[in-house]
Structure formats: structure tokens, C-alpha cells
Amino acid sequence: MRKIILFALFTLTTLSAKAHSQEEQVNINVAGIDLAISSNGPSSPSVHTFSRHTKYRSHLALFELGFNIPTNVSYGTTEPWFNLINAKSTQYTFNVFSVGTRLSPNGTVGLSAALGITWSNYVFETPTRVQRTDGMLTAEPVDTKGWVKSKINTFALHLPILLEVGQRKGFFAAVGGYGDLVVGSRSKIKYSKHNKEINRGLNLPLLQAGVTARVGYRRVYMFGNYSLTELFRNEGPSTNILTIGLGIGF
């Protein structure tokens, strides 16, 4: 966790330094509230609320909703079990802290980064129990009597970095990458009458990374994330996750 926070602070410091050296502004968004750090020189920084005169504003939205789709699934010698209901396998992302700076004189090209949290759900089509047994990740069917749903949840710190092209208050497109620090994972089986079974600590990869693209208008956009890191370690099925969804900001 320390490494990803330090990296986020390093990114902010780098963008701020660039802005100061060029007598520009770095715009910071904290939970939907905009601030602008400006400087007429290295010794005269100031912080003020966002205004219409601000040179550049990140397009990263405060909230993103996506749907997880497994790709390149391979089970090796094990029985297939990672079959998801894609419409229910959702991902929620809150970009709590974001920063942006322009890279072109007219402000049509910019660099954005954010630090947020991501909650991912992988909902199975059939009743499935996923747990670690003797150091291995195992999956087995469970009784359908009283069964409501079974799923895997992950919780991660999220750091996207994007190169944006477009109008500050209009249409834009962006490409970049992201890194996730997975701080929690669990499987859950829910039964009727409010009964449930939870298995924690699935030992998923701590660090996950991928590529991302966005296209939209102001802070409303469609996005796609593709994980270059497999969801499971060698003990689980081989799969990369594609997430497609919508971002909404202020």
C-alpha cells in the first residue's frame, strides 16, 4: 500500500513541478471538488478553487461503473468453473483524488492521473464454493437448495494514468494504463433466509496492471479496461479480465 501511495504522490509532484516550470496550473480534484495549483514562478505558488479560466481539467470521473468479462480462459487439467453472469459481475470505482495538467499550448492534449478505490464482483452462473485448501485455490459445486448466488469479491487501490486529447469542455479521447493494489479478496455464497458463507484470503496477485481507453464528453464517458495481469495465480484458471462501462463526474 505504501508503494502505490508514494507513486501517486510522486506523480502529483512531477505534474506540479512541470506546471510551475512553465508558469501553468495543475488542477486537482478531491471527491468532486476542484482546486487549481498555479505559479508565476518557482517561489510563488497559490491554491484556489477551480474557475472558468483554469487552463486544463482532468476528464477522469469521480465514479465509474463497469462489467467484468473473462477473456482467454484456460483451465489446464482442472474442471471448468469460472463461468460468470456478466450482467451481474460489476466493478465500482471511485476516483477520490485526481490531477491533470496540459501538455500542449492550446490545452487540447493533457496528462491525467488519479488515486481511487475499486470494488469488483465476479458472480457465478452456478452454485460454487471457492476457497484455499492446503495452499491451493479450489472450487466445488454446492447444494442448490436455498441457494441465491455465489461470487468472488476483490477490493483494490486504483491508480490510472492517461494521455488525453480533445476539448477541455467538449469531446475527448484518452489512452493509458492503470495499476491496482489488491488489499482484499473473498468468496461468498448467499442462501435464502439471510444465511451466507464467506471465505477470505484467496491469495490473488497483489499487484495487477492493465491498459485503458476512454471516449466521451467532459466527464461522462465510455471506458474499457483490459488487465494484462491474470486474475488468479498459477493455482487457479488462467484468465484476463476485460471491463467495459461508464464514467460519470462533476
Residue ranges and their predicted role:
Residues 104, 170-173, 219-224:
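Repeated loop/turn-to-beta-strand initiation elements of outer-membrane beta-barrel proteins
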Residues 74, 198-250:
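Predominantly the C-terminal beta-signal and adjacent terminal strand-loop region
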Residues 50-58, 101-109, 124, 169-170:
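Short loop/turn motifs that connect adjacent beta-strands in outer-membrane beta-barrel proteins
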Residues 1-50:
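Cleavable N-terminal export/targeting peptides
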Residues 57-61, 86-94, 153-157, 205-209, ...:
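Residues that define the transmembrane beta-barrel architecture of outer-membrane proteins
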Residues 67-71, 98, 115-123, 179-183, ...:
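Transmembrane beta-strands of outer-membrane beta-barrel pores
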Residues 52, 63, 92-100, 115-117, ...:
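Residues on the lipid-exposed face of transmembrane beta-strands in outer-membrane beta-barrel proteins
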Residues 70-88, 122-153, 182-212:
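Extracellular/periplasm-exposed beta-strand and loop segments of Gram-negative cell-envelope proteins
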